[in-house]
Amino acid sequence: MTLQEEIIRQLGVKASIDPKEEIRKTVDFLKAYLRKHSFLKTYVLGISGGQDSTLAGKLAQMAIAELREETGDQAYQFIAVRLPYGVQADEADAQKALAFIAPDQTLTINIKAAVDGQVEALQAAGVEISDFNKGNIKARQRMISQYAIAGQMAGAVIGTDHAAENITGFFTKFGDGGADILPLFRLNKRQGKALLKVLGADAALYEKVPTADLEDQKPGLADEVALGVTYQDIDDYLEGKLISKVAQATIEKWWHKGQHKRHLPITIFDDFWK
């Protein structure tokens, strides 16, 4: 088995999908998890205005609405959370995503004071934080807020990790990589886009340039620039297609580099890192 085949196997990616089937499968999965865990009544998810959180949020709201109708239990709720750092440049996209999702509840927590306070505390201790690491603090602070909300609201936190993100390790460890349930796992970027099209999302929500937008000094830095490879190449690779040797080498480099993010903290019994 080639490395490409092994990665595809691990991430469960299909070469082609039926978007309607995947929508139904995901909604049923989200419903089943809450039914199995009777102490949970809500899903919590940060909404950025990008493709991934828009899709995960819409599917979560659909699942919650169906659960309420099927059980008569009005305690089932989907809580969308806006988590800007100061003023978000593409706030209009976030509001467009919220209008599409139509969440039961929307909370807004501005993380700027918490992030800046942490950076200042570190500086006071003599630790200077790079702009890149400050970006990771932002991602982790967003999860702190989401887990606080989930803890108070009998909730589970939804993550937006999907195959094209997982293969590159393009997420912050214990930040956006920390979640309870991953409804988009197995889908690549273009497949997620296909689901949004079927769901009737505004094209602007899935055609915009993907960006983590974590660094102050590189606002709106495109994912593809940061990774040095296009999502088209990543998606083709995940669908078992041939791509250029340069693109393949870049993708596989990120796969190896990000292995630690796909595992629980390393113990003496682990050998994947050797």
From Swiss-Prot:
Enzyme Commission number(s) of this protein: 6.3.1.5
One cellular-component annotation, GO: cytoplasm
Protein name in UniProt: NH(3)-dependent NAD(+) synthetase
Substrates-to-products reaction catalysed: deamido-NAD(+) + NH4(+) + ATP = AMP + diphosphate + NAD(+) + H(+)
Binding site residues for Mg(2+): 52, 165
Residue positions binding ATP: 46-53, 160, 189, 211
Pathway(s) of this molecule: Cofactor biosynthesis; NAD(+) biosynthesis; NAD(+) from deamido-NAD(+) (ammonia route): step 1/1
Keyword Amino-acid biosynthesis recorded: no
Function: Catalyzes the ATP-dependent amidation of deamido-NAD to form NAD. Uses ammonia as a nitrogen source.
Sequence positions that bind deamido-NAD(+): 140, 173, 180, 260-261
GO molecular function terms noted in the UniProt entry: ATP binding; glutaminase activity; metal ion binding; NAD+ synthase (glutamine-hydrolyzing) activity; NAD+ synthase activity
Family to which this protein belongs: Belongs to the NAD synthetase family.
Record's subunit section: Homodimer.
Keywords attached to this entry: ATP-binding, Ligase, Magnesium, Metal-binding, NAD, Nucleotide-binding
InterPro entries in the cross-refs: NAD/GMP_synthase (IPR022310), NAD_synthase (IPR003694), NH(3)-dep_NAD(+)_synth (IPR022926), Rossmann-like_a/b/a_fold (IPR014729)
NCBIfam families named in the record: nadE, PRK00768.1
Biological-process GO terms, alphabetical: NAD biosynthetic process
Alphabetical list of Gene3D superfamilies matching this protein: HUPs
